[in-house]
Amino acid sequence: MLYSILCYDCESEVFSMTKEEDGELMARLSTVTARQEAAGKLGPRLRLMATTAATTVRSGGEVIDGPFAETKEQLLGFYIVDCESQEEAVETARRLAREKTNGTLEVRPVLWFDPGTSLK
């Protein structure tokens, strides 16, 4: 079954990291995802730009500059993993969390998934 691991963090802390600090963090996270990738269980993963680059479109078509949610932690990225159980997905999130200094990872089963076309 597919699970999403949603990555929430304090945007100002994440985007204030130096290039070296960010590179070290991504390298640590890659050691975790390498295991999933080798097993053919790692799907798309991404990091979003800052919410200052966001535009919100409400139902009906109203467009608002910036993010809708005004919270300390923002959704900054996600992983899609193929796991046998919720427990396996949670364990994957635990391994990722051990490599982070703060933030929250939310594990949620995927109800519908369309990989779309290959983007480059």
Feature roles, as predicted:
Residues 1-120:
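Conserved, structured core segments of small domains
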